[in-house]
């Protein structure tokens, strides 16, 4: 390949479903490599399978790419020099090249019926050999072809595969050898007149001047067919890079259902696009200095497809299935099930926490607002990017957030107006053992103090511990339940300064009364 050519990569999804994990990684790798090389990233829609392609899916794919921050330089909505960028609008182009291949005897019409082909496949299976089309109609005379056309016999068009050894020098997988005799004459135009995947992709990539084809390793087997077509059409062959297989926590290939999770589900679960982009980039690629958390904009500068590994990449977002289970989720369109199945110690959560901590507070607040919209337990005036209360709370709690969807429950803790103890277990922390003593002592010391900062409150609780002889769980749990009604939540020294002394005293008075603990001696 001419090394001086502008790098041009592409992502070419079929609009027949969501943009899933594997597709998102492919799009991202192509986008990042083009950007890092000062090149162009092209989006093309492969909708030649008219039975499966839908307008809704097309819109969702565009929405998903935009959320992920993968912006195309040419493609739908913006056009470009080499359009149209939707395959169903390029049928005349494919027809022109098909006529060329037929004229040069590099392709031929195949009049075999589906039933005949199925019978040949079954015969090969019975013999225990791979099925390879036998080229029955490869050498028909022009007269024989014309006769069948007059009879309006349906046909497909097959490429006449030359017998040779092909060596694919893949950027990621290395040198891979293919024997074309095991491929046989393959279909390039289906009986409905639409081009096959392998044919359309070659014509499009060639005419759109694609220099690098970056995709999942599952497409490696398509590569020899595509190279043969490039040669037959006399086009320069692009460089190929087949990214590693993605596996789950159990080391097995990511299941179709888990792998088909829409990336928009992660948006709806509170993950920022910066985080998800960072995580997806690490599925098969490493930076030259080994860093994993990469600031916004850096991936576009440093990504190099030559640093991708061919070893399987672990998608650790979901927990490992238990023995006997195939899935940790039975419905991957159910956000609740997805959330419950997620691995709390995943790299995605680690990156997400880092992102939320480091991001400008204004960006965090802007991204958070949609998660507050329907919460009745948070005052309307707080659901505002300019709210001082919201800013203070998020500044204090963001170090604890793995995703923004966790924030509303924490925020709501600050605005409880009718505090009640949430469970029998929580009540037990207040009433059992030295719980009442701890609650009374905390109330008394707080009433006679004027704490303002988290350090003030830490000192105050230490003093309660000294007086009562309690520490750890037996000290903090009674205080937590007395002030929040719950046995889990934010760290108390963070919560208390934001609530303030008076609100804390009111809360303790209410929960103590509910638990039957007298505060006066």
Curated annotation (Swiss-Prot):
It catalyses: tRNA(Glu) + L-glutamate + ATP = L-glutamyl-tRNA(Glu) + AMP + diphosphate. SUPFAM superfamilies: An anticodon-binding domain of class I aminoacyl-tRNA synthetases, Nucleotidylyl transferase. ATP binds at residue 256. Its main location: cytoplasm. One of its GO terms (cellular component) is cytosol. Catalyzes the attachment of glutamate to tRNA(Glu) in a two-step reaction: glutamate is first activated by ATP to form Glu-AMP and then transferred to the acceptor end of tRNA(Glu). Belongs to the class-I aminoacyl-tRNA synthetase family. Glutamate--tRNA ligase type 1 subfamily. This is Glutamate--tRNA ligase.
């Amino acid at each position: 390949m001419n090394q001086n050519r502008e790098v041009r990569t592409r992502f070419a999804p079929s609009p027949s479903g969501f943009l899933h994990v594997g597709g998102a990684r492919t799009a991202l790798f192509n986008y990042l490599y083009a950007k890092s090389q000062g090149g162009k990233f092209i989006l093309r829609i492969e909708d030649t399978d008219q039975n499966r392609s839908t307008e809704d899916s097309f819109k969702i794919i565009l929405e998903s790419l935009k959320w992920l921050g993968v912006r195309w330089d040419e493609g739908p909505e913006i056009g470009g020099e080499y359009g149209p960028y939707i395959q169903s609008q390029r049928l005349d182009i494919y027809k022109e090249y098909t006529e060329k291949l037929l004229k040069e005897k590099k392709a031929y019409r195949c009049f075999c019926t589906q039933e005949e082909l199925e019978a040949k496949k079954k015969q090969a299976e019975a013999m225990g050999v791979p099925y390879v089309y036998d080229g029955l109609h490869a050498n028909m005379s022009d007269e024989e072809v014309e006769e069948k056309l007059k009879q309006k016999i349906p046909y497909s068009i097959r490429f006449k595969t030359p017998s040779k050894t092909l060596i694919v020098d893949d950027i990621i997988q290395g040198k891979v050898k293919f024997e074309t005799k095991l491929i046989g004459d393959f279909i390039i135009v289906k009986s409905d007149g639409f081009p096959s995947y392998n044919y359309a992709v070659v014509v499009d990539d060639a005419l759109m001047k694609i220099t690098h084809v970056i995709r999942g390793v599952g497409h490696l087997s398509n590569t020899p067919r595509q190279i043969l077509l490039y040669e037959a059409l006399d086009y320069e062959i692009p460089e190929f890079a087949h990214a590693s297989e993605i596996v789950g926590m159990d080391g097995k290939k990511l299941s179709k259902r888990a792998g088909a999770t829409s990336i928009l589900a992660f948006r709806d679960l509170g993950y920022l696009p910066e985080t998800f982009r960072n995580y997806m980039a690490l599925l098969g690629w490493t930076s030259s200095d080994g860093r994993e958390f990469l600031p916004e904009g850096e991936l576009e500068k440093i990504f190099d497809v030559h640093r991708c590994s061919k070893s399987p990449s672990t998608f650790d977002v979901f927990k490992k299935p238990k023995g006997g289970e195939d899935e940790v989720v039975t419905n991957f369109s159910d956000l609740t099930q997805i959330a419950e199945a997620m691995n709390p110690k995943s790299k995605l959560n680690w990156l997400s926490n880092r992102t939320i901590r480091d991001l400008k507070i204004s960006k965090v607040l802007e991204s958070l607002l949609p998660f507050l919209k329907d919460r009745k337990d948070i005052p309307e005036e707080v659901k505002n990017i300019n709210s001082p209360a919201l800013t203070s709370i998020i500044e204090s709690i963001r170090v604890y957030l793995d995703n923004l969807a966790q924030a509303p429950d924490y925020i709501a803790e600050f605005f409880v107006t009718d505090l009640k103890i949430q469970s029998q277990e929580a009540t037990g922390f207040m009433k059992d053992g030295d719980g009442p003593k701890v609650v009374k002592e905390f109330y008394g010391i707080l009433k006679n103090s004027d704490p303002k900062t988290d350090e003030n409150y830490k000192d105050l609780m230490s003093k309660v511990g000294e007086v009562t002889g309690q520490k750890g769980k037996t000290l903090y749990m009674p205080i937590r339940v007395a002030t929040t009604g719950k046995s889990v939540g934010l760290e108390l020294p963070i919560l208390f300064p934001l609530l303030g002394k008076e609100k804390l005293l009111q809360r303790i008075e209410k929960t103590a009364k509910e638990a039957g603990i007298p505060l006066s001696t």
